[in-house]
């Protein structure tokens, strides 16, 4: 309706300036008036299409009143536009006076129709909100129960596994130390035995040191070279065993730790 009032205002303004436009550019004046009338026709057509979408007997009277008001408004605008040029000021005033009540009636009908439709829109929104709230009330306890059960199960599993993890960690450390305590003495014993044999050999060779110094030194070095590989071989053979034990316990610990965190 604001656009309808704008079109009427344009017609009035063009009418009040008719003499000036006729003196300067009469074709431009006619173009503006024709455009305003075309716009009023479009407004009437669009309003009638909108009214057709209102169903029910409650709105029939409003549809009829509003349609009649738009038709009369269009007729007034058409008649006044044709008479504006020779009688600009008189017809402009007459148009405003003659259409005042009609324009007020149109605005009243539109506001009345809006007030009739507003409760239905509010009722629809209220009904939808009610259904949403009902669904939320029904689903929320289920979600809460499911979430609580998951948390409870996770806490129970964690409570059961934590002592087990501590035992495994302690057992792992204990097994490593136990294995080391058994293997290291064996290596040390072999090393001690070999060292003793070398010392015995050196003691036995001492009296002949000066006489057979060069030969004895050479013999001792040869003996050392022969014994050293056996010592290194023993250590090499034991190292994979130690590493295998360490890797096995580490993998076991990591697997259980991941299961708890999951």
Curated annotation (Swiss-Prot):
Region (10 X approximate tandem repeats): 64-262
GO BP term, example: acylglycerol homeostasis
Sequence repeats: 64-85, 87-107, 108-118, 119-140, 141-162, 163-184, 185-206, 207-228, 229-239, 240-262
Superkingdom, taxonomy of origin: Eukaryota
Gene Ontology molecular function, alphabetical: cholesterol transfer activity; phosphatidylcholine-sterol O-acyltransferase activator activity; phospholipid binding; protein homodimerization activity
Keywords: Cholesterol metabolism, HDL, Lipid metabolism, Lipid transport, Repeat, Secreted, Signal, Steroid metabolism, Sterol metabolism, Transport
Keyword field contains Signal: yes
Localization (cell): Secreted
Residue span of region 3 X approximate tandem repeats: 32-63
First and last residue of the signal peptide: 1-18
Record GO cellular component, one term: extracellular vesicle
Family: Belongs to the apolipoprotein A1/A4/E family.
Subunit structure: Homodimer. Interacts with naxe and yjefn3.
Function: Participates in the reverse transport of cholesterol from tissues to the liver for excretion by promoting cholesterol efflux from tissues and by acting as a cofactor for the lecithin cholesterol acyltransferase (LCAT).
Full protein name: Apolipoprotein A-Ia
Organism in which the protein naturally occurs: Danio rerio (Zebrafish)
């Amino acid at each position: 309706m604001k656009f309808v009032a704008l079109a009427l205002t344009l017609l009035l303004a063009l009418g009040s300036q008719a003499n000036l436009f006729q003196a300067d550019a009469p074709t431009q004046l006619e173009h503006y008036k024709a455009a305003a009338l075309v716009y009023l026709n479009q407004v009437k057509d669009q309003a009638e299409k909108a009214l057709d979408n209102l169903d029910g007997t409650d709105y029939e009277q409003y549809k009829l009143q509003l349609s009649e008001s738009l038709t009369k408004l269009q007729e007034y605008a058409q008649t006044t536009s044709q008479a504006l040029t020779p009688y600009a000021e008189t017809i402009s005033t007459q148009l405003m006076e003659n259409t005042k009540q009609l324009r007020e009636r149109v605005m009243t009908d539109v506001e009345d129709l809006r007030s009739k439709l507003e409760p239905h829109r509010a009722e629809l929104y209220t009904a939808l909100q009610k259904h949403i709230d009902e669904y939320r009330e029904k689903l929320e306890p289920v979600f809460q129960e499911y979430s609580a059960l998951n948390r409870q199960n996770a806490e129970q599993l964690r409570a059961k596994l934590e002592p087990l993890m501590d035992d495994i960690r302690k057992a792992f450390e204990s097994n490593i130390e136990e294995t080391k305590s058994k293997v290291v003495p064996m290596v040390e014993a072999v090393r001690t035995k070999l060292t003793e044999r070398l010392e015995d050999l050196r003691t036995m060779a001492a009296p002949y040191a000066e006489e057979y110094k060069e030969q004895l030194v050479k013999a001792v070095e040869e003996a050392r070279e022969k014994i050293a590989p056996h010592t290194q071989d023993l250590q090499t053979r034991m190292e994979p065993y130690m590493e295998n034990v360490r890797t096995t316990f580490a993998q076991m610990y990591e697997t259980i730790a991941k299961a708890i965190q999951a």
